[in-house]
C-alpha cells in the first residue's frame, strides 16, 4: 500500500506504465482513496512493451521480473547507464538478465538473490550541472571521477555554445567564455539530451545574446 505520487514544476508523475507492466506479470493492483493497493503470489514471466521509454518503469519491471517464474521480455526498455548498472548489480546478486543497454531486455526468473558489491557509476546529471556552473561563472574547472562516454550528446551540445571542454577517461576540463552562443534543443531518452538538465541549460541560455528554444 503506497500513496499516489505527486509531481514537480516540470509536470505530473503518472505511474500507469508501472502498473501495466506489473499487472502483466500477474500483480493485482487497484487505486483506492488516494492509495495504490498491490498484491500478488509469485509473479509470472511475461512480455511487456512500453508505449514510451520509462527509466523508473524499466527499473521496476526489471526488478520484479528477476524473481518471477519463467522468462520476461521488456520491450522498448530504457537504455540509461543507471538501468545498465541496476541490471549488473542484479546479475551479481544471482539474477539472469541479458540485453542491458539495448531495446529489449530478457530476464530468466530465479528463486532467490544473494548479497553483492558494486561501485556506483558517477552521476552524469551532477557532472553537467557543475560544467554549466563553471561556464556561467566564466571559470575553469577540473571535474574528476566522471564518465564522459555517458555524456557524449550533452557535451557536444555544450561545446556548441562556445565553451571549451577537454575530456579524458575519467576527467573533464571546463573553461568558460565571454561569448556564449544560444543553443536550442529537444530532450530525448538516452543517449539524447536528458530532461533533468533542461533547467540548467535554460539558465545557461539566459546569459547569451540571442534566442533559444527548449
Model-derived features: positions:
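Structural preference for solvent-exposed beta-strand-turn elements
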Residues: 1-214
Amino acid at each position: 500500500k503506497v500513496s499516489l505520487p505527486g509531481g514537480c514544476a516540470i509536470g505530473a508523475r503518472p505511474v500507469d506504465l508501472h502498473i501495466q507492466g506489473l499487472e502483466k506479470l500477474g500483480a493485482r493492483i487497484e487505486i483506492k482513496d488516494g492509495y495504490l493497493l498491490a498484491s500478488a503470489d509469485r509473479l509470472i514471466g511475461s512480455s511487456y512493451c512500453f508505449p514510451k521509454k520509462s527509466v523508473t518503469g524499466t527499473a521496476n519491471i526489471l526488478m520484479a521480473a528477476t524473481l518471477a517464474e519463467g522468462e520476461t521480455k521488456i520491450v522498448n526498455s530504457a537504455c540509461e547507464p543507471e538501468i545498465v548498472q541496476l541490471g549488473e548489480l542484479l546479475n551479481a546478486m544471482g539474477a539472469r538478465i541479458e540485453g542491458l543497454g539495448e531495446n529489449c531486455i530478457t530476464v530468466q526468473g530465479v528463486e532467490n538473490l544473494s548479497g553483492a558489491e558494486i561501485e556506483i557509476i558517477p552521476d552524469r546529471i551532477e557532472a553537467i550541472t557543475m560544467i554549466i556552473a563553471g561556464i556561467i561563472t566564466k571559470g575553469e574547472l577540473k571535474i574528476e571521477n566522471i564518465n564522459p562516454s555517458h555524456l557524449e550528446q550533452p557535451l557536444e551540445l555544450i561545446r556548441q555554445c562556445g565553451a571549451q571542454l577537454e575530456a579524458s577517461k575519467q576527467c573533464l576540463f571546463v573553461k568558460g567564455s565571454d561569448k556564449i552562443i544560444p543553443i536550442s534543443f529537444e530532450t530525448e531518452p538516452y543517449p539524447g539530451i536528458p530532461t533533468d538538465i533542461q533547467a540548467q541549460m535554460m539558465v545557461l541560455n539566459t546569459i547569451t545574446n540571442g534566442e533559444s528554444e527548449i
